Amino acid sequence: MLNAPTYNTVHMITVSKEDYLKAILEAESEGETVISATLAHWLKVSPPAVTMAVRRLKKDGLVRVDADGRVRLAAAGRKIARKLTIRHHLIERMLAEIFGMEWFKVHDEAERLEHAVSPDFEARLLAKLGSGIACPHGNLTEVESPASHRRRGLFLLAQAEPGHDVQVSGIYERDRQLLEFLEQRAIRPGAKVHVAHRNYDQTLTLTTAAGRVSLGVSAAEKVWVKPLDAKLSSKP
C-alpha cells in the first residue's frame, strides 16, 4: 500500500483499517456472514491478524461483534466503507476513461490509490467524470447485493438458458486472473454473448466476439447479464 495519509470525513484511520471496513461491506453485499475466517480469506491474512484488527475496530466504534462472532459495521464504519467504495469507483473510471488503462487492470491500481485521495481531489474527479455511471467492470457506485442486481432485471450468466442472447452487465472485479480469463474470451461489460449449449457438468458453450468458447460454472457465476430477447428465461 502507499505510504500516504488516508482521508475521510469521519476518522483519520490507517490503510489497514480501511481495508477491513471495505472488505466487511463487500462481503455483506454478497450475502456472506462475516466472521474472522471470512475476512482472513478476503484479505489474505492470518486469523490471528484478523482477530487483532477486529478488536481495534471494535474499540474505535467502527464495528460490532455479535456473541456468535459475526462482525457487523457500525454506522461510523459503514460511512467510511461506503466513502472508500465511491473513491475506488471514481479512480477506476479515471484510469480507464482518462488514461486508457484496460478494464481488467484498473481494480488493482484503484486498490493502491484509493487511500491517498483527498476530499478535494475526489470532488474534482466527480466533477470531471460525473456520477451515476458504472465502473469499467459494469458495477454501480453503491455496492450491490445479488437481490439488488435481480431487481434491475439482471441474472447470472450461469443461469442463462441455451439458445438465447445476453449482454454482459457487470463482473466480479476482485479476481484479476478471472478478469483476464474473461477478457481473452471477449466476455467484458457491454459484450453480447450467445448461449449455445449447457453441458452435463453445467459448463457453458458460448459464442462471443472471440468465437466459440467454454466457460465453467465458477466463472459464469461471477458475470451478471441482461436479456437481449423478450422470451429469455433463467433457471430459478
Residue ranges and their predicted role:
Residues 30-40:
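Short acidic, hydrophobic short linear motifs in intrinsically disordered regions
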Residues 3-6, 114-224:
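Mid-protein regulatory/catalytic core that forms ligand/cofactor-binding pockets
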